[in-house]
Amino acid sequence: MATPIRWNQRGRVAPYGGSKRTDTPLRSLALSLTHVARAALSEPYMLTIEHKRIQLSRLPKTFDGFRVVQLSDVHHGPFSDREQIERAVETANRLQPDIIALTGDYISKERHYAAPCAEMMGKLKARFGVYAVLGNHDHWTDAALITDLFRAEGITVLVNEGMRFEKDGAAFWLAGVDDSMVGLEDISLALAGARDDEMKLLLAHNPIVLRRAVRASVDLVLSGHTHGGQVAIRGERATTRPRKRLLKGLWRQGNTQIYVNRGLGTVVLPIRYGCPPEISLLELRSK
């Protein structure tokens, strides 16, 4: 017959009846694993706001302080429910952004989640609009359906295309590429029409685009896809290998910077550890 257990005042497990047991390495390991499991199951609900100031030498002074809120990898489905997403939308709106950038993977694989996800994304509010690109999961599900639903909600979906973003006589180029993993990314097409000397902001789901963005003289790339690793065993900068280095946060290669958002949802398992879901508040500063 199993012995009931309780937590004593020091956080150790002891049997009812008053007798104390000496901790063993195995018991300590079991407690540690229990703690990790609880943290991993609760962390997907621990929404965080990452506020970064990004210096851009070609950003016109008119846009100094321009606020971009980025959301990524919503993955609406069994692991990412309406309550989580609606809370993220409300949080994003409270940040009063100039634009909102959505960087792909809105659903995981079930088409019936597309319409409610689009409805929730349609409640995002920004001074100059909401802009989106598609991710690999969107293509694996139904990219055309998601694109149509988002556009019906007033969201500008950029599919290898760009536009000149103008304000008070100043401008920069805002572009978005289709997903790299499905072989549809075309930076040249997205930047067609951009002037050589103007600041270029690129939305791309997969950060693997970075090297091509550098060659195309893009100033800033906003990406997602990685979920920050979803489970982080090592420190954030424990490795210098390029692909590992681009799991999350702000990085630079040459004159190009990239910000990789950890995303809101999860895949495979509904867990996160050391990688809480993120809303990015990116404040663009001119040098």
Model-derived features: positions:
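Acidic, histidine-bearing metal-coordination/catalytic regions of metal-dependent phosphoesterases
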Residues: 1-68, 78
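Membrane-embedded segments
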Residues: 62-156
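Beta-strand-turn-beta hairpins that frame and shape the catalytic cleft
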Residues: 47, 56-69, 155-156, 163-175, ...
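Conserved acidic residues
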Residues: 98-100, 105, 198-201, 219
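Mobile, glycine- and charge-enriched loop segments
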Residues: 46, 51-80, 177-204, 209
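Active-site metal-binding loops of divalent metal-dependent hydrolases
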Residues: 72-76, 104-106, 136-137, 161-162, ...
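Conserved beta-sheet core of the metallophosphoesterase superfamily
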Residues: 152, 207-284
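Binuclear metal-dependent hydrolase catalytic cores centered on His/Asp/Glu-rich metal-binding motifs
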Residues: 148-155, 159, 167-204, 210-211, ...
